[in-house]
């Protein structure tokens, strides 16, 4: 196990470029940090161990030793992890870059074997080739990769990943790209490598190669908001900001293939980029569809539908002395925009329900209450219109000119009054609402702070370093809600 880690340790003194590229945290003397009990492959040292969350992308893909280096596969610095990273589509040319890099960094020839023989201190006969002391020579070249699927963007991180484990909680899946390259051609590459090995090690090398290179690919899995850590979220004025660290290179390459061409033919440029790179910290907003869905689900879980039957004059989030309507504690760590939306939505539904139903106290048990929760849970799904129509039909609508309408005459506060006028684009509010008007008002209240169609599905910490730098220069990393404000707010 951990053949790739051992190879990085022993091969790091071979050449100058190896000394810079093969320094990984798993071979350092640093004290390990606390793990998060997620077992998987560290994509930097390739060992199967307990993982922690990366400081660059907030995903669990790095071990408790390598996390000290603060390296991420999304960095622009050409360290070893970056050199093993390619974006889809994967072509034969890109796979050839991976093979050439392995052959350059981890060569197997007579000089290398003799060098390791001199360094090995065996308890038994020095001429005995034991896998315990020569594990670094048993590193075959395979085309297995850990694959991250960020919606339509797919990122491959190639490495020699040994062992098996359940992948249910991992943000990536293992894929074998041998058929994209050529199965027989890759076999030939490895047969040439193992031909220089002593016969005792050749069998072990072949066993490792065929075991890993013939593994089937897993089905890709989307990365979800639940895969990201909340440890690097900070709350300022009840808005959340995510801290991310990236290693930024002063030298840029347009494509991954250009980077590998310099690795093969212009090593000085790679060394310059490694020594001049700097770590940069970004504060990025955490407004994304995944987080909004999570907040909406939590809001639906904690909401008190009894408020729509009450006579409370306070906003729904401010009621504290009522056992049926008190939800104040749920907003302690929630975005203030969610609280504002909750207050307006509950106030509007209360006004509609009190205008059409004969209820007078929040202790009343009404059949409409579960549907109010569904409004929050379905607010970001395609079922929202169907849910709102069901809610509308539970408010005792009447038929006028073959159209269902409900009365709308209960008191509302001034801010909600102005907001509804803006949504309906009218000078005076109607005293009767049709189903499409009811739906438009509710969806307008829900979408008042951000347009769901324009919000990214995942946090922007998964964007490339070049994209983060461009957004930083344009001021688009700010947590201010104006950056994601909906189009309807500009119509007033």
From Swiss-Prot:
GO terms for molecular function: metal ion binding; RNA binding. Residues 42-79 are annotated as: Zinc-binding domain. Residues 1-81 are annotated as: RNA-binding. Residues 318-492 are annotated as: Interaction with host IRF3. GO terms for cellular component: host cell cytoplasm; host cytoskeleton. Residues 82-176 are annotated as: Important for cytoskeleton localization. Its main location: host cell. The keyword Acetylation does not apply. InterPro entries: Rotavirus_NSP1. It is found in: Host cytoplasm, Host cytoskeleton. Keywords: Host cytoplasm, Host cytoskeleton, Host-virus interaction, Inhibition of host innate immune response by virus, Inhibition of host IRF3 by virus, Inhibition of host IRF7 by virus, Inhibition of host RLR pathway by virus, Interferon antiviral system evasion, Metal-binding, RNA-binding, Viral immunoevasion. A motif (pLxIS motif) lies at residues 483-486. GO terms for biological process: symbiont-mediated suppression of host cytoplasmic pattern recognition receptor signaling pathway via inhibition of IRF3 activity; symbiont-mediated suppression of host cytoplasmic pattern recognition receptor signaling pathway via inhibition of IRF7 activity. The keyword Metal-binding applies. Belongs to the rotavirus NSP1 family. Plays a role in the inhibition of host innate immunity by inducing the degradation of key host factors required to activate interferon production such as IRF3, IRF5 or IRF7. Associates with components of cullin RING ligases (CRLs) including CUL1 or CUL3, which are essential multisubunit ubiquitination complexes, to modulate their activities. The integrity of the zinc-binding domain in NSP1 is important for degradation of host IRF3. The pLxIS motif targets host IRF3 for degradation; however phosphorylation of NSP1 pLxIS motif is not required for its activity. HAMAP family: ROTA_NSP1. Interacts (via C-terminus) with host IRF3; this interaction leads to IRF3 degradation. Interacts with host IRF7; this interaction leads to IRF7 degradation. Interacts with host CUL1 and CUL3. This is Non-structural protein 1. It comes from Rotavirus A (isolate RVA/Equine/United Kingdom/L338/1988/G13P12[18]).
């Amino acid at each position: 196990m951990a053949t790739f880690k051992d190879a990085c340790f022993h091969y790091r003194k071979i050449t100058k470029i190896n000394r810079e590229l093969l320094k990984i945290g798993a071979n350092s003397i640093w004290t390990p940090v606390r793990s998060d009990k997620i077992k998987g492959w560290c994509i930097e040292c390739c060992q199967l161990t307990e993982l922690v969350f990366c400081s660059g992308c907030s995903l669990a893909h790095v071990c408790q030793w390598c996390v000290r280096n603060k390296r991420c596969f999304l960095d622009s610095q050409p360290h070893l992890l970056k050199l093993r990273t390619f974006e889809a589509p994967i072509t034969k040319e890109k796979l050839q870059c991976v093979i050439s890099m392995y052959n350059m960094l981890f060569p197997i020839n007579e000089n290398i074997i003799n060098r390791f023989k001199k360094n090995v201190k065996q308890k038994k006969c020095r001429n005995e080739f034991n896998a315990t002391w020569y594990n670094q020579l048993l590193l075959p070249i395979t085309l297995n990769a850990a694959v991250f699927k960020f919606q339509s963007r797919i990122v491959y991180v190639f490495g020699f990943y040994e062992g098996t484990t359940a992948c249910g909680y991992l943000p990536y899946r293992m894929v074998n790209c041998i058929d994209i390259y050529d199965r027989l051609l890759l076999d030939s590459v490895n047969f040439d490598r193992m031909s220089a090995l002593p016969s005792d090690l050749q069998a072990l090398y072949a066993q490792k190669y065929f075991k890993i290179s013939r593994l089937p690919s897993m089905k890709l899995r989307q990365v979800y908001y639940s895969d990201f850590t909340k440890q690097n979220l900070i709350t300022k004025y009840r808005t959340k900001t995510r801290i991310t660290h990236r290693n930024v290179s002063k030298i840029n390459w347009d494509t991954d293939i250009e980077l590998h061409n310099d690795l093969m033919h212009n090593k000085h440029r790679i060394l310059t980029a490694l020594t001049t790179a700097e770590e940069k910290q970004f504060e990025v907003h955490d407004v994304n569809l995944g987080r909004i869905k999570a907040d909406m689900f939590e809001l639906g879980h904690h909401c008190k539908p009894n408020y729509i039957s009450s006579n409370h004059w306070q906003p729904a989030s401010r009621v504290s002395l009522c056992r049926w309507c008190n939800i104040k504690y749920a907003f302690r760590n929630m975005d203030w925009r969610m609280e504002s939306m909750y207050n307006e939505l509950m106030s509007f539904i209360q006004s509609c329900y009190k205008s059409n139903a004969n209820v007078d106290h929040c202790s009343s048990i009404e059949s409409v209450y579960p549907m109010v929760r569904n409004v929050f849970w379905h607010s970001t799904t395609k079922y929202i219109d169907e849910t709102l129509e069901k809610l509308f039909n539970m408010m005792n609508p009447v038929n006028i000119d073959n159209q269902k309408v409900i009365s709308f005459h209960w008191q509302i506060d001034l801010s909600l009054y102005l907001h509804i006028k803006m949504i309906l684009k009218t000078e005076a509010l109607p005293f009767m609402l049709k189903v499409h008007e009811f739906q438009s008002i509710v969806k307008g209240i829900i979408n008042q702070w951000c347009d769901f169609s324009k919000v990214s599905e995942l946090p922007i910490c998964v964007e490339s370093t070049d994209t983060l730098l461009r957004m930083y220069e344009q001021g688009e990393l700010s947590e201010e809600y104006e950056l994601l404000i909906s189009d309807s707010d500009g119509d007033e």
